[in-house]
Amino acid sequence: MEAPEFVVGFPTLGDVWSAWMERHCRVPDRHQRGAPFREYDWQFWCTANHGRVRPEATHDPEHPLLNQAFVYRRSQVIAPQKMGKGPWTAARVCLAAVGPTEFAGWAQVGDEYRCDENGCNCGWIYPYLPGEPMGRRHPSPLIQIMATSDDQVANIWRPLVSMIGLGPLKDLLLPRGEFIRIVGTSGDKDMDRIDRVTASAQSRLGAPINEAFFDETGLYTKSNKLIEVFTTMRRGAAAMGGRSMETTNAFDPAQNSAAQQTQESQRSDIFKYWRDPDLALKRPDGKPFSFQNARERRKILSYVYAGAEHINIDSIEAECLELMETDSSQAERFFGNRLVRGGGSWLPPGLWEGCHASAVASAA
């Protein structure tokens, strides 16, 4: 499988974040269950960008910059099925709860992040490089995970609970059924917790959260009223200097979903990760590759799954071939990472990009 050049040449908390997750989080399932959770290349690239610090950022312990210390206020990941979005998001939730997510200045010689100074008894120490951004725990975290239903939110919640039980985080994160208690210092029962939000469970909507995680935002639409929930949670985070991350499969451009609105936003403080094969892979005549062509399909799959070492392209392609016998659009959307309309027809080349560009020009 060809791998892209994921080169991190900017100041970021992503290095300490990734190292922290490897030390504290565990692989939740499969044959490696219980092993240290190590990010795939594409995951680290997204983590590094979410943790990208503004070079001019300064640190005042009494008045921290919070989300304004970072280049990106929020992130979006559009990726095909089985890329590892759920377990990775679970690890990022753990990090947001008890890891060094806040910018805490620039390291000098000898500076370290020490778990024993941050409520964790595992003994881990991360030595910073001089000039590297440093991190600290949030003093009173309130985190929400949103999905369309209980079954959908389980894509994150299930690996999250497993990660906690399999490693050192079981002393810091205490699952309590519908929420997870974070062992902290605030003593506030309404803070220091991780909550789940769905279409039918919105009792804590509007809370002053510091981090929000949205699963399958391609399914949040105006008709199911989840765009309203999506924006309400983002407002709650913005008021507290918080941040958010959304993950999804390729969206249906006929639905104007939350994922589509994020992708079409012109805000420069949103990090977007989407390996769109129709923009990157073209024939000599300029037309995108066809999923019906065996050789071109293989190149599409290799491109969109780049950086995911656990993926077996032969297995993915075998499932695609069977799906294509009855519903080619599913194969193209969920595995080919392409925009496919609900009616099953793939968008003509350049149509979505052209409409998007026209809308932006009209709004200017």
Question: Where are these predicted regions, by residue range?
Answer:
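Phosphate/NTP-binding elements of NTP-utilizing enzymes
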Residues: M1-A364
